[in-house]
């Protein structure tokens, strides 16, 4: 080439870096956000808009954040930011859960239990200081994720005002009649020395002893008569039970049978040379006898369970204790014997049976529950068969009790069972049911259960199965144990009568008075309070209780202590947490909301799955498969983590591995490269001067704006239904297919070769400006750092941050009367695909090197040919090929053929044209390039 025409081309130019370099670039953006008080500015721009309130469920203030925290906070952040673009004011007030056992354990490890080196006041202060330190660490990590919120004024459950509002919330619940006191079996952790909530329990496999124990009948003939059988004089009669908790047998006070189950009187194994008949559920008889070494099922009679009611048995090792046969609807024929040993101090269903029969007051507290808070039998526990139980831990007692049963001849079978068993979420140790005096929010009193079930149906659940799940949980849950026997928490400020144990009749009003003091001085004031201040002359008749509130009550009343306190409306628009929160925060918030206001505190509930590795295994240190968010940020950047979260179906388990992160990085690169190409071609474009009206745009440019409009509608709808994976896929497809494989490829010719201010070039730049202005908004909720950076390179005057705007309004659909309609483009793009398929084998066989070397002939039916012939001169730009000819033919649809060109190649645009050499000044250029270099410039209408 004798002349260098490169300087006549308008190649892309931008300072927007090709490499994201996110680990270095993101902290600088964060610094600017901090310096500019970005959250305050965001709220100021949104002032006066409709409110969208996503209420933050508080993470626990203990330990560094993990991947699950990152998933949760980033999903919330994506929603908050998308709502701002959607025209809402979407405040975000982060919070922390600060009371409870994990912090107590951390302080105990350092200083010992309360009373060792610290008194209770000092201990609570150390807990408070520890929680504050943990909040600082977690806040730093959350902000590094790009989470925008009121980080300078978060809510903390340890704040005096919050603690006071929590007591006021409890007072409301007392006013509504939902609080009761009772001695009931509750989940108990010996290591905690306290009751546990349902949400503080996790199920882990455990090996337990499995025993069948015979309870002899005191009047065997009468019991046999129930089965229309006559008991021979030398035959014993017993009812076997099956249990995996032999340690509860000292508390066994009855046997429950199913009233409608069928029972049979069968021949059992001999005992001391004597025959023994057994009563078993018919459906379980053969299986039970097999455990006892009996192969033959010999039935002496049958009866319904109801017929055995109130017959009396003997305790297997306490001869002076009589055991009544009671009816229990919880008894099933699924396993065991069909008879359930009933210890009302160690089982909720057992307790309910005794309550129904009015038997609870017939026994002392030690008889109902002979086990202390540490898991040791009380000194009053009776011994048997040389076995002294008093002072023995129940787990050590299990094998000793089995041996003693064997010696007494009442052990029918013994084995071990590997099964799922409840454990303390913090200590990872087995827990038990243990009857203790506790305070409960009653599910039945004041009809809380039915009101909660109704409220659930007025909430929108994402995914939809969440509704059925929480309905089932509420239908079956027991009363909520809200009292804890610990130190670090909000006290239950009740005065109870010294003799009757009844709460003071003015309890709610007294609570509010205590709350006023707590707001000024903190929870310690309750313990130092002189009760004569509040009770006057009644003070001697009452005593303060020292229990604290369940931490799930703390977080469960945030709708009251945070939203109302900050002037925000209830119910919140959205609660968003992990799937385990159906039994945690969603449920505690629901119950307090219904108890106080007779309504759920949220309109929508969204749950996300847990993070697992590529094999579906839970991430853990022991497996060595954990990936920490801090490591991802350090090596790849927060936007890569955000993109992975957004692109994953969070309704199920969320898989992450290094390979998945690599694919996510590739996807990010595609998005960034697309943005960079768009910006590069906007070099020298000023929208205030050069923007082409939509009606004057080249047809292809107008069509891509139409496509962007369609995609924006799809993206907005997906953000509304929280389907972020669809958004990411839509954007990636747009980058690859609509832009990369089509629009950007086709328009390079116009952008590079036309005169700088040519209408055809300005039309393409206008389209790219519209695309970029929309594109940056589409990605902003997800790729917040990259969108911030991209926004700073967008030409023209605009707001300081993309999130100060709303969805881009410069897009519009093609009008029905457009010269080329959307339907026309669908057909043309189908034609383009056919052309590509025809050229592929020619390129593969070396017939042509590039599509520009091929001349295309399209034979089409008359109507199609007539429609396409006006486009003939420009179809070559759409196909990026040589000349195109359209001819009518007697055919349905169209037929594409191609042949190599014989024309010369233009040194500037690389097209093969017949007029090369016709211009003496530019003999190496085609006529189009000559007019673009030295003339008025070419005219383009379609492509």
Swiss-Prot record:
Enzyme Commission number: 6.1.1.5
Gene3D superfamilies: 1.10.730.20, HUPs (3.40.50.620), Valyl/Leucyl/Isoleucyl-tRNA synthetase, editing domain (3.90.740.10)
UniProt keyword Hydrolase, yes or no: no
Keyword set includes Aminoacyl-tRNA synthetase: yes
Subunit structure, as described in the record: Monomer.
UniProt-annotated location(s): Cytoplasm
Motif ('HIGH' region): 59-69
Residues that bind L-isoleucyl-5'-AMP: 577
Main location: cytoplasm
Binding site for Zn(2+): 906, 909, 926, 929
Residue numbers covered by motif 'KMSKS' region: 618-622
InterPro entries per record: aa-tRNA-synth_I_CS (IPR001412), aa-tRNA-synth_Ia (IPR002300), Anticodon_Ile_BEm (IPR033708), Ile-tRNA-ligase (IPR002301), Ile-tRNA-ligase_type1 (IPR023585), Ile-tRNA_ligase (IPR050081), M/V/L/I-tRNA-synth_anticd-bd (IPR013155), Rossmann-like_a/b/a_fold (IPR014729)
Record Pfam families: Anticodon_1 (PF08264), tRNA-synt_1 (PF00133), zf-FPG_IleRS (PF06827)
Organism this protein belongs to: Xylella fastidiosa (strain 9a5c)
Cofactor note as given: Binds 1 zinc ion per subunit.
Cofactor needs: Zn(2+)
Name assigned to this protein: Isoleucine--tRNA ligase
SUPFAM superfamilies per the UniProt record, alphabetical: Anticodon-binding domain of a subclass of class I aminoacyl-tRNA synthetases, Nucleotidylyl transferase, ValRS/IleRS/LeuRS editing domain
Transmembrane residue ranges: none
Binding residue positions for ATP: 621
Domain notes: IleRS has two distinct active sites: one for aminoacylation and one for editing. The misactivated valine is translocated from the active site to the editing site, which sterically excludes the correctly activated isoleucine. The single editing site contains two valyl binding pockets, one specific for each substrate (Val-AMP or Val-tRNA(Ile)).
Molecular function as annotated in GO: aminoacyl-tRNA deacylase activity; ATP binding; isoleucine-tRNA ligase activity; tRNA binding; zinc ion binding
Keyword tags: Aminoacyl-tRNA synthetase, ATP-binding, Cytoplasm, Ligase, Metal-binding, Nucleotide-binding, Protein biosynthesis, Zinc
